[in-house]
């Protein structure tokens, strides 16, 4: 292909992370997005109304041809993909397993935008797991797609630092933009023939499992640094939560926003115990020191300050909040 010829691209993606990559492609004059694939509209929110994906909304705004197959088991869907005549497929958080027939539908194959420094954190939740594990650095990898999950040869990588108070939601937005920029650079170099794929070292691979609501259950038996990493990693979803036990009253499930690491415990305390109010923040005992929470939300209530929570709820509380006793997914 001549370097000056725009790449004909079929884009495959679904959520906001993917929409950022599509937005960068649409702003680049080196390609022509000839088709877009995204997951079918699905019910979401309290009203369970069907809503289009972020990628679909962006694609329709630009008048692009949007397809939403449930899978590619039907040969007719694979043939419809071939009929676009794309040079290359670009995949970003699509959410469907792509059979070899799909990967072979374009002469240059398929490339993927992945939110980690592969081979670390292959899988569905690389951004959240990096934060939850307390990593200081993560990044974006653009790699070729193969049948094995996130195991294809790497084309380009770029690292990004993780702030000590940064949530997975904040990191997601930064990585989404970085991914879009790195994608365009990768495609430009592929078009020019100036990039060499690098195989991944499978021995260094780790897996980032998809998050569930149970991942938000705060484990106060961990150190305050580890608790802070967990709370940041599950913000905004599924959110950090635990159960507050109040004498003579029903237990109350509460969610918390990321707080700060407090001072060392002055005396031993059972992890999960509320040990005081510090500058308007509720102080929870962890394995080594306190964790200070300034915003807390009881079930079915609006968020409130730590001081308001102290006055409104803890006057009738036993003073112990053993989150580790909560039923998973409750």
From Swiss-Prot:
Catalytic reaction equation(s): L-methionyl-tRNA(fMet) + (6R)-10-formyltetrahydrofolate = N-formyl-L-methionyl-tRNA(fMet) + (6S)-5,6,7,8-tetrahydrofolate + H(+)
Source species of the chain: Nitratidesulfovibrio vulgaris (strain ATCC 29579 / DSM 644 / CCUG 34227 / NCIMB 8303 / VKM B-1760 / Hildenborough)
GO CC aspect terms: cytosol
Name listed for the protein in its UniProt record: Methionyl-tRNA formyltransferase
Superkingdom of the organism of origin: Bacteria
Function: Attaches a formyl group to the free amino group of methionyl-tRNA(fMet). The formyl group appears to play a dual role in the initiator identity of N-formylmethionyl-tRNA by promoting its recognition by IF2 and preventing the misappropriation of this tRNA by the elongation apparatus.
Residues noted as binding (6S)-5,6,7,8-tetrahydrofolate in the record, renumbered to the chain: 116-119
Classification via HAMAP family: Formyl_trans
InterPro entries in the record: Fmt (IPR005794), Formyl_trans_C (IPR005793), Formyl_transf_N (IPR002376), Formyl_transf_N_sf (IPR036477), Formyl_transferase-like_C_sf (IPR011034), GART_AS (IPR001555), Met-tRNA-FMT_C (IPR044135), Met-tRNA-FMT_N (IPR041711)
Keyword Protein biosynthesis part of the UniProt annotation: yes
Group of enzyme by EC: transferase
Family classification: Belongs to the Fmt family.
EC number(s) recorded for this UniProt protein: 2.1.2.9
Keywords carried by this UniProt record: Protein biosynthesis, Transferase
Gene Ontology molecular-function annotations: methionyl-tRNA formyltransferase activity
Pfam families noted in UniProt: Formyl_trans_C, Formyl_trans_N
NCBIfam families hit by this protein: fmt
Record bears the keyword Electron transport: no
């Amino acid at each position: 292909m001549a370097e000056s010829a725009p790449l004909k691209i079929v884009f495959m993606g679904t959520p906001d992370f993917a929409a950022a990559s599509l937005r960068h492609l649409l702003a680049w004059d080196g390609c022509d997005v000839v088709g877009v694939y995204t997951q079918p509209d699905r019910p979401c929110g309290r009203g369970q109304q069907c809503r289009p994906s972020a990628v679909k909304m962006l694609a329709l705004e630009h008048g692009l041809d949007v397809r939403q197959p449930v899978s590619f088991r039907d040969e007719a869907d694979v043939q419809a993909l071939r009929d676009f005549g794309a040079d290359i497929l670009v995949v970003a958080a699509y959410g469907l397993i792509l059979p070899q027939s799909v990967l072979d539908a374009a002469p240059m194959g398929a490339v993927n935008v992945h939110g980690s420094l592969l081979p670390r954190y292959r899988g569905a939740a690389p951004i959240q797991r990096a934060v939850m594990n307390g990593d200081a650095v993560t990044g974006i990898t653009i790699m070729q797609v193969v049948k094995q999950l996130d195991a294809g040869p790497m084309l380009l990588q770029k690292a990004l630092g993780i702030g000590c108070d940064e949530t997975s939601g904040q990191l997601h937005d930064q990585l989404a933009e970085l991914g879009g920029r790195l994608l365009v650079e990768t495609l430009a170099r592929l078009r020019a023939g100036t990039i060499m794929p690098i195989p991944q070292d499978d021995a260094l691979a780790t897996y980032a499992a998809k998050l569930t609501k149970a991942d938000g259950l705060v484990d106060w038996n961990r150190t305050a640094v580890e608790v802070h990493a967990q709370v940041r990693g599950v913000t905004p979803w599924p959110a950090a939560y635990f159960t507050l036990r109040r004498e003579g009253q029903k237990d109350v499930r509460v969610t918390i926003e990321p707080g700060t690491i407090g001072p060392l415990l002055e005396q031993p305390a059972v992890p999960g115990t509320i040990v005081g109010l510090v500058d308007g923040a509720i102080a929870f005992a962890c394995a080594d020191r306190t964790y200070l929470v300034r915003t807390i939300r009881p079930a079915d209530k609006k968020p409130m300050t730590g001081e308001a929570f102290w006055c409104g709820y803890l006057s009738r509380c036993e003073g112990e909040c053993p989150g580790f006793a909560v039923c998973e997914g409750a």
